[in-house]
């Protein structure tokens, strides 16, 4: 039967990653470069090699990266949850406020909206232009309303129009005055390596939100998210987030109560299979050839 669900790779695409399942067997020495036995507990923020790999996708420093399990949506939900329950960097927990609002560029990702809806957060639609969200609307809303705490962004090849945010839009998001000191950009760069063409001249380029925020004097404004869901296997990949050193320290302090660590064997499997940024690009070219 025909499956009309959007966002699911075809069988031929899934088959590309089947050799990854042969990389680790009962005879494999499951240790990282530091010599840590990955079969055991530990390494809250992910093995170093996986942090380096995911940092190449997230365009960030490995020191600012945390590697999780298979789902970036899970990370985003937990990130909203931490802001809701604990607040971020000493700010008032969102749950204690009379009202919390989020900006939602439309068309956008329904699962993003499902997260904010689950917390009772009021969602404000923002029109999308060919270069990203309408920044005149965004800037007015965030400047005048302290209850606007965040914005959902799929900044590259976003569905359904394939929009990539322009440099100007990225810089405006990073630098715009906000009434809320704890305003956060939820930067879901889900399609960062999903180019259709090999020639760099034919690929969209996205300005790094972290660099833009640092340059604008708002280094804690962004949370970046990504995963290998549409790179290797959607149900069995690895995911990661990147943020400022302050935010990462805050997140790890909360995470340390929630978990001892994620699936390090799968992190090792992905490192051995994809290797590095060049390996990811080579693998994604195979996806593009199928499409």
What residue ranges belong to the model's regions?
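Walker B catalytic acidic pair
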Residues: 189
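Conserved core segment of the aminotransferase class I/II
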Residues: 210-288
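Short acidic, S/G/P-rich loop/turn micro-motifs used as interaction or catalytic elements
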Residues: 10-13, 157-160, 232
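Short aromatic-enriched loop/helix-cap "lid" or pocket-rim segments at secondary-structure transitions
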Residues: 14-18, 196-200, 235-238
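Hydrophobic "anchor" residues on beta-strands that sit immediately upstream
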Residues: 150, 184, 223
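Conserved core of the PLP fold type I
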Residues: 29-30, 35-181, 192-217
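Conserved beta-strand scaffold positions in the cores of enzyme catalytic domains, especially
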Residues: 3, 123-125, 222-224
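Conserved N-terminal helix/loop that builds the PLP phosphate-binding region
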Residues: 1-33
